[in-house]
Amino acid sequence: MSTPAKELCRLGLREAGAGVAAKAISSTELVEASLARIQATDGKLGAFLAVCADRARAAAKAADARAARGERRSELDGVPVAVKDLFVTKGVPTTAGSRILEGYLPPYDATVVERLEAAGAVIVGKLNMDEFAMGSSNENSAYKPCHNPWDLSRTPGGSSGGSAASVAAGQVHASLGTDTGGSIREPAAFCGVVGVKPTYGRVSRYGVVAFASSLDQVGPLAREVGDAALVLRTIAGHDPRDMTSSTRPVDDYLGPLEEGARGLRVGVPREWLSGGLDAGVEAAIRAALDTYRRLGATLVDVSLPHSKYGIGAYYLIAPAEASSNLARYDGVRYGLRAEGAKGLKEMYAESREQGLGAEPKRRIMLGTYALSSGYYDAYYLRAQKVRTLIRRDFDEAFRGCDVIAGPVTPSVAFALGERTGDPLQMYLADIFTITCNLAALPGLSVPCGLEAASGLPVGLQLVGRPFDEATLFRAARALERELGPLPAPPEP
């Protein structure tokens, strides 16, 4: 008797892969269940910008053939996943959530896409996002908003909103997103899934549409800590096509996963719990910290004194880099081209006017101003100095602890439309996540319960030393094992 499609969709990533390997279920069954789930739910969720049904079915058929021969590429072989529409995919539209790339068909795959497919994972589609990854609510998508599976009137977070919503809703077993200032961890927290921002340089950015090149990083989202660890192990490692890619060997993330929290020193920054948090979020975070103490970890008071300047530094550095990266979208080589322009300069201007949304334009203006003659030293250079101080704060804190723990966001998922008219309020959603990017450190969001008042998920943020993702996974798994999984969100 076959397993109902809905049950297949709620299987963990490793559980689904093991089922394919044991021939208890087929990759074709998993993929058809995923496609049916997307068809049934995405009209309300809006998590997908493109569904690659034919490509996915062909990949599933190949995975089943390998299973029949007793071959297995990896634990991911035959399992449906999806990727943010920021990763180029050969022959599949890649828009970065922007009109200016509407209809663009890349001639090659991003490195992380190559690595997923080499491991046998089946990519079923491309996921919704804020335009060029600029946003914290997925409302900046040029195509449609994405909704939170826990409450369709609320944001899933951004910019990787589709990546989190698709996993939480059981459309796929895992996904990839990008994180420039919190864009994996915030949606993961809002949607009640695990989201990982690796150390800068741990995962190749080749084939990822650039936002802020010194901050962008690729990472996984999944419903279980171990599943996220497996995906990261699959995509991590040196890539000669990305000059920022580290040559450091990839650690075994799964080996220490079940070692527990006993003996861990968990740093708690006093600046992160000193105000500005909604009461329900603070209660959930403090309860999670108490759980670590109960499990044998030692809570250590640490200070990150320059973290209060993180928002200001980030919103100078990131727009400055974006203003350069987005200069290539001019209507000449690919994407939207304005018709009827009387000359080259007018065509440039009209193509960008028609193709770019309000948030990219705002950040291009901010970045161009910060880099302009007479203002570079006062703004951009000073922001980079603050970045150095933030990195030193973390170095000092890690002298006395193994991981740092605190909130991901000041609140649970907020209502769609609530902050679109106030960019500053939107930017403040990233207040706890931005410093991790500025310091190039690994960070992770793991569910730590539901807020009592709203019943919405709360995420605990864990930050680690450079390239010590293994300790983050160990600490996150200890909490996950003790608290148990969150219930599935309501049916859309």
Curated annotation (Swiss-Prot):
GO terms for molecular function: ATP binding; glutaminyl-tRNA synthase (glutamine-hydrolyzing) activity. InterPro entries: Amidase, Amidase_CS, Amidase_dom, AS_sf, GatA. The keyword Ligase applies. One of its GO terms (cellular component) is glutamyl-tRNA(Gln) amidotransferase complex. The active site is at K84 (charge relay system), S159 (charge relay system), S183 (acyl-ester intermediate). It holds the Pfam family Amidase. It is an enzyme of class 6 (ligase). Keywords: ATP-binding, Ligase, Nucleotide-binding, Protein biosynthesis. Its EC number is 6.3.5.7. It catalyses: L-glutamyl-tRNA(Gln) + L-glutamine + ATP + H2O = L-glutaminyl-tRNA(Gln) + L-glutamate + ADP + phosphate + H(+). Heterotrimer of A, B and C subunits. Allows the formation of correctly charged Gln-tRNA(Gln) through the transamidation of misacylated Glu-tRNA(Gln) in organisms which lack glutaminyl-tRNA synthetase. The reaction takes place in the presence of glutamine and ATP through an activated gamma-phospho-Glu-tRNA(Gln). Belongs to the amidase family. GatA subfamily. PANTHER family: GLUTAMYL-TRNA(GLN) AMIDOTRANSFERASE SUBUNIT A, TRANSAMIDASE. This is Glutamyl-tRNA(Gln) amidotransferase subunit A. It comes from Anaeromyxobacter dehalogenans (strain 2CP-C).
